[in-house]
From Swiss-Prot:
The keyword ATP-binding is assigned to this record: yes
Gene induction: Induced during growth on caprolactam.
Entry text on domains: The tetrameric structure and the presence of a connecting tunnel suggest that the activated lactim moves from the CapA active site to the CapB active site without release to solvent.
GO molecular function, one term: ATP binding
Family annotation (PANTHER family): 5-OXOPROLINASE RELATED, HYPOTHETICAL 5-OXOPROLINASE (EUROFUNG)-RELATED
Stated name of the protein: Caprolactamase subunit alpha
Species per Swiss-Prot/TrEMBL record: Pseudomonas jessenii
Gene, per the UniProt record: capA
Top enzyme category: hydrolase
GO BP: any one term: glutathione metabolic process
Length: 696
């Protein structure tokens, strides 16, 4: 860190906005404020006021003393989910107006052959997709000139329709962007207040549908993201921030607002994408680099997998039914949070989620007007949370209200007890989360028994051990800052810019053009370095370039991404690259064809400026071991067939390093509870992380 004292991470979630403040002495503090979806700056102001009160300083003094303020946000994600983006017009090559609906000729995976599955909502209605004459062909040459009269006509129509953003995507613009560049200039000149983006800039790789879809999503979200960034930047400027606010990207890196307001598609997973970085940091003191990080907040349940210290990425994938081409940390998101609503479906079956009570009105026990029981209400009814406890330091829980809601909405209609209904709610939400974990592990060739489970989010501590039992994980790690782990991950992250290009080329020795290939790698690297310099980084920072090549067997239509360990290829490293591709193909598809020719399709280069991390917490180890003493006991129910148990409750602030506590018990931290079920034990590590393992 620099001479400034603090680094601040802010994660704006659906229910709470989390603040992590770290200083240069290893102190990490967590604060929470209820989210304000209508204006994110209100939650940030409230959180900064809490921090100021705790430190005896003003918000302006704290911000002025921060070397970096980082914001992860769900603004872009929520706009895509709720369809609250802006009105978009599309300029496309004549004859390609329907590519968004034709897609790849089928629906997304999981519904490919389901004739009853409805088509995705189109972000650009048919009448706003305007065909433009002119054609670039695959070698980059102009087959026919751009029809500027058609562009003028489209501009007039967009003006009449009050379009707020224009996406431009022409065929083969990745080989020659001149037509897109001319169209952009014309639209910007005629419609100066309208946001404009083009496919060759947003996603400069082949495949028309993916490029068009990604560009349209970017146009749909960027004005929304831009307004949010404008308010946040103004707030921090008002408070005297020494550096521009950095925003967390879906690729796990940071970028300034001036970049993110133009590339909102890179912020779709801005919130949950920081969790795996934090998960790896939490696991490091234990010598673990295979982790599955699960983040259960009030609204959703996010799952990421990291193997060997590297987090899985997705690219060219369907996200909320829209094809997104840009690289993103692979996050599996479920509608399973503390605020997920339990209800009976049309057949009288108990269901949990995906609807959520959110921050307002929230669960019934919040006393803010909620009437439908949630997962949090069930946890409170079963004794895992304390009646009258302050959630997040500000919301007092009402157990009787939770019990009454479960009785009237679930138990009585089903003819069962409140206890059985509450256990059923917890069981169902756990099964849903286990299914999600299996999708990111077993279905992608990973054995979850080889991974530690990292619990993040305010609600995860009450569920994660049951999830570990189901998937066979033998280690669960829950840091004291678990409920703010995404904000914690933000302060550990680096500046990152991804550069992409397409370069079709046979990789056989007799066909490959190493000079052209190395020149393309150098150009990507230089573009990324330019981005870093424009962002004010690159001088004193350690720069790292990570390369990956998308390769396939000749004639295939999909590629495998293979990492390149050098920044320049020769004959020897080319042979090693081909062998790495064969191995990767076999790992993914169970076979390889070493004697078949292979071809390169795409190149990627991630240019990263490594930032100095703030030091991590280090708790003192007592000279003499003592037994942990419960702060009290309360009845809890762990199974519908069992009796209530008088269960010890421990105050997390009084647990010392090295003390081993046997379950069942609950550990109460300021912003989360950890449920240790029967058959598990827990101890506190000097890194301020609870380690939970099965056994006595």
């Amino acid at each position: 860190m620099s001479k400034q004292q603090y680094r601040l991470g802010i994660d704006a979630g659906g229910t709470f906005t989390d603040f992590i403040l770290a200083d240069h002495q290893g102190n990490v503090q967590l604060f929470k404020a209820p989210s304000t979806p209508h204006d994110g700056t209100l939650a940030i102001r409230n959180g900064l006021a809490q921090i100021a009160d705790a430190l005896g300083r003003t918000p302006a003094e704290i911000i002025a003393d921060c070397d970096l303020c980082i914001n992860g946000t769900t603004v872009a994600l929520n706009a895509l989910i709720e369809k609250t983006g802006v009105k978009v017009g599309l300029l496309c090559t004549d004859g390609h107006e329907d590519s968004l609906e034709i897609r790849l000729g089928h629906k997304e995976d999981g519904h490919r052959y389901d004739a009853t599955y409805p088509p995705a909502h189109m972000l650009v209605p048919r009448h706003l997709r305007r065909p433009i004459g002119g054609r670039i062909i695959s070698d980059g040459s102009e087959f026919s000139p751009l029809d500027e009269a058609a562009i003028h006509a489209a501009i007039d129509y967009f003006r009449e329709q009050q379009v707020q953003a224009v996406a431009i995507s022409f065929v083969w613009s990745v080989r020659n962007p001149s037509h897109e560049q001319r169209a952009m200039a014309m639209v910007r000149a005629a419609l100066p207040d309208v946001f404009v983006c083009s496919g060759h800039e947003v996603f400069p790789q082949i495949r028309e549908y993916t490029r068009t879809s990604t560009t349209v999503v970017n146009a749909y979200l960027s004005p929304v993201m831009g307004r949010y960034i404008e308010r946040i930047d103004a707030l921090f400027e008002e408070l005297g921030a020494q550096q521009p606010t950095r925003y967390f990207q879906s690729n796990g890196g940071l970028a300034p607002g001036v970049v993110m307001r133009e590339r909102a598609v890179n912020a779709i997973n801005s919130g949950p994408a920081s969790a795996p970085q934090a998960g790896l940091c939490v696991a490091q003191p234990f010598g673990i680099d295979n982790v599955i990080t699960v983040d259960m907040g009030g609204t959703s349940f996010d799952i990421t997998l990291s193997k060997g210290g590297r987090t899985n990425f997705s690219k060219d994938s369907d996200f909320l039914r829209y094809r997104i081409g840009v690289p993103m940390i692979q996050v599996e998101t479920l509608g399973a949070g503390g605020g997920s609503i339990a209800h009976l479906d049309d057949f009288g079956m108990l269901q949990v989620g995906p609807r959520s009570a959110g921050a307002n009105p929230g669960p019934v026990c919040y006393g803010k007007g909620g009437v439908e029981p949630t997962v949090t209400d069930a946890n409170l009814a079963l004794g895992y949370l304390a009646d009258g406890a302050l959630l997040g330091g500000s919301i007092r829980l009402n157990r009787q209200a939770a019990i009454d809601a479960i009785r009237s909405k679930i138990a009585e209609p089903l003819g069962i007890s409140v206890e059985r209904a509450a256990v059923g709610i917890i069981t169902l939400v756990n099964l849903s989360m286990v299914s999600g974990i299996r999708r990111v592990s077993i279905e992608r060739g990973y054995d979850p028994r080889d991974f530690a489970l990292i619990g993040a989010g305010g609600a995860a501590g009450m569920h994660v051990m049951r999830l570990a039992e189901e998937i066979g994980s033998k280690v669960v790690l829950i840091p004291k800052v678990a409920s703010g782990l995404c904000a914690f991950g933000q302060i550990l992250s680096d500046i990152r810019y991804d550069q992409l290009t397409t370069l079709p080329m046979r990789l056989d020795d007799e066909f490959v053009d190493l000079e052209q290939l190395n020149q393309a790698l150098q150009q990507l690297r230089e573009r990324g370095m330019t981005n870093l310099r424009d962002d004010g980084f690159g001088g004193d920072n350690r720069i790292e370039c990570q390369y990956s090549l998308e390769i396939r067997y000749l004639g295939q239509i999909h590629e495998c991404s293979v990492e390149l360990s050098c920044d320049r290829l020769d004959r020897s490293s080319l042979a090693a690259l081909r062998e790495s591709f064969h191995q990767r193909h076999k790992a993914l598809f169970s076979y390889s064809e070493p004697n078949s020719p292979v071809e390169l399709v795409n190149l990627e280069c991630s240019v990263i400026a490594r930032l100095q991390r703030p030091p991590m917490p280090e708790l003192a180890t007592p000279l003499k071991a003592t037994a942990a003493i419960p702060a009290g006991h309360r009845p809890m129910l762990f199974n519908a067939q069992d009796d209530w148990q008088d269960t010890p409750v421990y105050n997390g602030d009084r647990i010392e390093v090295g003390q081993i506590i046997q379950g069942p018990c609950v550990i109460e931290e300021a912003t989360t509870n950890i449920l240790v079920p029967p058959g598990w034990r827990v101890s506190l590590d000097p890194s301020a992380t609870y380690e939970l393992t099965p056994g006595h």
